[in-house]
């Protein structure tokens, strides 16, 4: 098992960044970061617990697809947990990756985005520090792209 965490500050309020990064991710991510996200589709559910989504990644990304299931979502406290359970994004060595996201208010009126990841590896497989670093950097890049998109398109929230 491998665990990784990071946090990023944002000028956007917790409610605005939660809406963009969680509720409207399916439509905003391909617009904000088309070099990473080709499409995101809901396979099952309505966005709540149990919802299953499929992500198709753009050409140039080192993997093509992933599927994840929403484990918990709390719109009042701006948090979500989901588990990636399928796709080459798991690199053949990860059985599943559970992500916990929380958006907290900051003193300046913005927010702090906290993200923790727990990876269950297959058999004796282990994630390298480089693997974990690449995942963290990719997620940070996506967060900043969505933040920039929302600032440029305030009607999105």
Curated annotation (Swiss-Prot):
Keywords linked to the UniProt accession: Allergen, Pathogenesis-related protein, Plant defense
Protein's GO biological process: abscisic acid-activated signaling pathway; defense response
A molecular function (GO) term: signaling receptor activity
InterPro entries registered for this protein in UniProt: Bet_v_I/MLP, Bet_v_I_allergen, Plant_def-hormone_signal, START-like_dom_sf
GO cellular component, as recorded: cytoplasm; nucleus
Cited Gene3D superfamilies: 3.30.530.20
Family: Belongs to the BetVI family.
Name the UniProt record assigns to this protein: Root allergen protein
Biological source species: Taraxacum officinale
């Amino acid at each position: 098992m491998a665990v990784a965490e990071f946090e990023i500050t944002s000028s956007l309020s917790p409610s605005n960044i939660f809406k963009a990064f969680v509720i409207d991710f399916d439509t905003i991510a391909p617009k904000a970061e088309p070099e990473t996200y080709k499409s995101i589709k809901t396979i099952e559910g309505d966005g709540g617990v149990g919802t299953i989504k499929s992500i198709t990644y753009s050409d140039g990304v080192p993997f093509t697809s992933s599927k994840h299931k929403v484990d918990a979502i709390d719109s009042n406290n701006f948090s979500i947990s989901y588990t990636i359970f399928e796709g080459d994004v798991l690199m053949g060595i990860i059985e599943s990756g559970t992500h916990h996201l929380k958006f907290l208010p900051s003193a300046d009126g913005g927010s702090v985005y906290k993200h923790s990841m727990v990876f269950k590896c297959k058999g004796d497989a282990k994630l390298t520090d480089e693997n974990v670093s690449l995942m963290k950097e990719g997620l940070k890049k996506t967060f900043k792209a969505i933040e920039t998109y929302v600032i440029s398109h305030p009607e999105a929230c």
